[in-house]
Amino acid sequence: VYRLSGVPRMHERPQAALLQALRELGYRIDSENDKLPLTIHAEGPKAGSCTVNITKSSQFASALLLAADQGGWQIGIEGEQGAASPYVAMTSSLIEYFPKSGGRFAIEPDASGGSYFWAAGHILSGEEGLPVKVARWPRSGWQIDAEFPSCLPLPVQTSRQDDLGDSIMTAIAIAPLAKRKTEFTELGRLRLQECERVEALRTELAKCGAVVSETGDTLTIQPGLL
């Protein structure tokens, strides 16, 4: 029996889709509201199938896929592009290419974190003697955020679902420095994770003097001095 809990924010994050999938596989999970804290009654691997909805987080599908071989599970995925969702597709590619019988495997650098350095290089591009270069940038095509350099300078509109993953937050942070108004769309999932990140971005950019408007799950940012 495993009892899981976390910091207060973790108790707010939605877990229902993952818990429902595990219950479909035959596992008993006790939770008052399908969030942490919860108790999992483990029974070892048991073959079965389930469907997981990734509308609120693709991490649910990635977690199940990584354990599926040992568990004997067949995983169906629905919501927000399903199995073609960028982070789910990356997980599937990793599972396919990882050497099951041992060996050497090169782990790619994290493109989401690397976006900060591309952003810094873009901001400083006109400053003499301040070059920023990023070595060994991922080129496998697995990481959606490896597209970040191609989004500089920022386009008029960027979608979290189709254009960038977590690095869209880096793009939002530098948007006030752009030469034109920029829109960032389909940001809803950012509200559900470490914090309410859409609100946090709008609030903190406004503190710096940026003009930011929030309409539904879209942020619109005007260029200007900070």
Language-model segments: residues:
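Structural preference for solvent-exposed beta-strand-turn elements
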Residues: 1-226
